[in-house]
Design a protein with these regions (language model features):
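Boundary at the C-terminal end of the N-terminal hydrophobic targeting segment
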Residues: 21-25, 29
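Charged, solvent-exposed structural "stalk/scaffold" segments
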Residues: 28-68, 81-120, 124-126
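Short, solvent-exposed mixed-charge patches
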Residues: 135-137
């Protein structure tokens, strides 16, 4: 008898909260869309400034990483999350290569290389975690 009461109470609670979850969805979707637009504009602005020589490549990587991470985090499918993470890995690889080149010319140090290596490894770790079970390994 207690089990029936518990299940009934759970069912009622679920019915009470479900409409509020659906009501949040359009608001959340609007926020997600607006944030994607803002982050995209930031990337475009930083790239423009980089082309003009008024900012460095770190600013470009940071802006792109923010956009890609956001898109990964709000993606609704595992495949889309993985696609965004693959782009993050590619971005981190380019960043590491550029920092290594600067270190070779003496304009960067070994700590910067280590930090960029860590960022790449963290991105690859996340990519591995997002892989479907059958493709891990």
């Amino acid at each position: 008898m207690n089990l029936k009461k518990s299940l009934f109470s759970f069912g009622i609670a679920l019915l009470m909260f479900t409409p509020s979850l659906r009501a949040e969805t359009p608001a959340r979707a609007a926020i997600v869309k607006e944030r994607d637009t803002v982050l995209s504009k930031i990337v475009a602005d930083v790239e423009s400034r980089y082309s003009a020589g008024t900012t460095d490549d770190e600013a470009v990587w940071t802006a792109k990483l923010s956009l890609l991470s956001f898109r990964r985090d709000v993606a609704t499918t595992a495949g889309e999350k993985l696609k965004q993470q693959e782009q993050i890995v590619a971005l981190q690889e380019k960043r590491l290569n550029a920092i290594k080149e600067r270190a070779n010319t003496g304009t960067s140090d070994s700590l910067a290389v280590l930090r960029a290596t860590d960022a790449l490894l963290a991105a690859k770790q996340m990519q591995a975690e997002l892989q479907p079970e059958g493709k891990k390994g």
